[in-house]
Design a protein with these regions (language model features):
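Phosphate-group recognition and catalysis centered on beta-loop-alpha active-site segments
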Residues: 1-236
Length: 236
């Protein structure tokens, strides 16, 4: 069995403690009240029907988003859907008090400014606070302008499942540097990477995706931690 297969089988894995990779103290400074009444948000809300059904049950919802440059539109899903973010936000006339985790799949150097401009326009059309949208990307370096404009921002922890063991150190070093050099509000990742995130990003506000069968067992431990801001759960 590959070493990584052994590492990834459990949700709470022991981190690889590289002695010369030390998290900076300033990571613990990015804390504060983000106005979340509940830490439990709903995962995979990629249809207006699902949002409408659960609107009164949760304070926050995760939506997968792809920006289409040709149509200057945010499409919901992973690229093949026709539902737009405007369609999603039209399900209720009043979105105040609700938060949306936007997992934007294609932010890059070339389109970051256009995506920011269109997101600002979207919040205006739908009468939403920019601080109620969490823009998520593995490219923390492209999120600073979003943060400066009033959006909440989140750096996605890299997936390690298919990374060769000899390359894990390099991947984690790069992740730490990206976080240190950015102004993002959170770091997020699958709960299976809990120990890695806890060890390398101590004190950083965290968001977790907890979509496995063990959710009920893991939630009580994670939710009571002061550095846990949000846990995404699947619909029961």
């Amino acid at each position: 069995m590959h070493m990584n297969d052994k590492l990834m089988r459990g949700y709470f894995m022991a981190p690889l403690k590289f002695k010369d990779l030390v998290a900076e103290d300033n990571m613990s400074e990015r804390e504060g009240s983000f106005g979340f009444k509940s830490k439990i948000w709903l995962y995979g809300v990629n249809s207006p029907e699902k949002l409408a059904k659960n609107f009164n049950k949760y304070d926050g919802f995760e939506i997968d988003v792809v920006y289409n440059e040709k149509e200057r539109t945010f499409f919901v899903g992973r690229g093949s859907g026709k539902v737009t973010l405007d369609d999603m936000f039209a399900v209720k006339p009043d979105l105040s008090g609700k938060f949306f985790w936007l997992d934007v799949k294609n932010i890059d150097f070339n389109n970051q400014s256009e995506i920011l401009r269109e997101l600002i326009a979207l919040t205006g059309r739908n009468i939403m606070h920019k601080s109620h949208l969490v823009v998520v990307s593995p490219n923390a370096e492209y999120l600073d302008d979003f943060a400066a404009s009033g959006f909440l921002t989140c750096f996605r922890f890299p997936s390690l499942y298919r990374v060769k063991r000899g390359d894990i150190r390099k991947v984690l070093e790069a992740a730490v540097e990206k976080y240190k050099n950015s102004t993002v509000d959170f770091i997020c990742g699958d709960v299976r990477y809990f120990n890695f995130m806890d060890f390398y990003f101590p004190g950083a506000p965290k968001m977790y995706q907890n979509t496995g069968r063990e959710a009920k067992n893991i939630n009580p431990y994670i939710l009571k931690r002061s550095d846990t801001s949000v846990v995404l759960n699947q619909e029961p």
